[in-house]
Amino acid sequence: MRKLRGGQTKETRKQKQERREENLKIQQQLKTIVLPICGVFLMCIVVYVFLKTRPRFEEL
């Protein structure tokens, strides 16, 4: 049993199961929300750097 913060009571099976479910939910949100946002942000940086560093040909 795990001791809860700020108290003498210990964690019950139900509380432990709820905590596990919350952790799984957070991991799922990480995969569906945070990683795609980071991917889009990274792609924006790559495109910006590409556009700023490409050689520009002036017509003669």
From Swiss-Prot:
It is found in: Membrane. GO terms for cellular component: membrane. Keywords: Coiled coil, Membrane, Transmembrane, Transmembrane helix. Its main location: membrane. Belongs to the SMCO4 family. PANTHER family: SINGLE-PASS MEMBRANE AND COILED-COIL DOMAIN-CONTAINING PROTEIN 4. This is Single-pass membrane and coiled-coil domain-containing protein 4 homolog. It comes from Aedes aegypti. The lineage of its organism: Eukaryota, Metazoa, Ecdysozoa, Arthropoda, Hexapoda.
